[in-house]
Amino acid sequence: MMMKWIISILTMSIMPVLTYSSSIFRFHSEDIELCYGNLYFDRIYNNVVNIKYIPEHIPYRYNFINRTFSVDELDDNVFFTHGYFLKHKYGCSLNPSLIVSLSGNLKYNDIQCSVNVSCLIKNLATSTSTILTSKHKTYSLYRSMCIAIIGYDSIIWYKYINDRYNDIYDFTAICMLIASTLIVIIYVFKKIKMNS
């Protein structure tokens, strides 16, 4: 009987920490999917290029608020930035809760194009940022068109330290874990003392 109580109290004490960490991981993994997709590059004339980026997957819980796209060209190098501003579908705020910025450069000649891409995801709901980077990847140019399948070589994920709401939540979860552990230890010692 005592073992059941110990297991149930320990389970209840660990649940807030597990729930919090799994929700961060879920947000983190779904947000990263916005950085994967296909980049279409088409050189229409000598000095006119057309770039289009289509993400593979858009998480169902976000609505697009706005997007920006800028392209600069210097000789055979094209620099582009594609920004998404998304809002949580069920949130009450009108402000964006997710900002995704895909930027990179594309170098081309008559037979191939080389793409170097980085993606920054800033999740304002979880106060986390993710940076994905790729090295130069080469693709064949077919009829002045190049289709680049975007993949990444490194992923860096970090959480903001100065966010007050997440710090309060972290502190509450840790206090609950410590308090419930102390309750279990005191209960076990009292039971042992009574039995001896």
Curated annotation (Swiss-Prot):
Induction: Expressed in the late phase of the viral replicative cycle. The chain crosses the membrane at residues 168-188. Keywords: Glycoprotein, Host membrane, Membrane, Signal, Transmembrane, Transmembrane helix. Its main location: host cell. Glycans are attached at residues 66, 116. It is a single-pass type I membrane protein. Residues 189-196 are cytoplasmic. It is found in: Host membrane; Host cell surface. Residues 1-21 form the signal peptide. Residues 22-167 are extracellular. GO terms for cellular component: host cell membrane; host cell surface; membrane. Belongs to the orthopoxvirus OPG172 protein family. This is Protein OPG172. It comes from Monkeypox virus. The gene is OPG172.
